[in-house]
């Protein structure tokens, strides 16, 4: 499935496997154990 992040851009990072590009507000297919949504306010500081 897809997780669509658009309202809490400053605190959301979408992480996947080692080949994924990670951007705020991105849409990525999250499948298996390699897909994770992490809420971390300090990530971009």
Curated annotation (Swiss-Prot):
GO terms for biological process: hydrogen peroxide catabolic process. Its EC number is 1.11.1.7. Its cofactor is heme b; Ca(2+). It is an enzyme of class 1 (oxidoreductase). It is found in: Secreted. Binds 1 heme b (iron(II)-protoporphyrin IX) group per subunit. Binds 2 calcium ions per subunit. Keywords: Calcium, Heme, Hydrogen peroxide, Iron, Metal-binding, Oxidoreductase, Peroxidase, Secreted. It catalyses: 2 a phenolic donor + H2O2 = 2 a phenolic radical donor + 2 H2O. One of its GO terms (cellular component) is extracellular region. GO terms for molecular function: lactoperoxidase activity; metal ion binding. Its main location: secreted. The keyword Phosphoprotein does not apply. Removal of H(2)O(2), oxidation of toxic reductants, biosynthesis and degradation of lignin, suberization, auxin catabolism, response to environmental stresses such as wounding, pathogen attack and oxidative stress. These functions might be dependent on each isozyme/isoform in each plant tissue. Belongs to the peroxidase family. Classical plant (class III) peroxidase subfamily. This is Peroxidase 3. It comes from Capsicum annuum (Capsicum pepper).
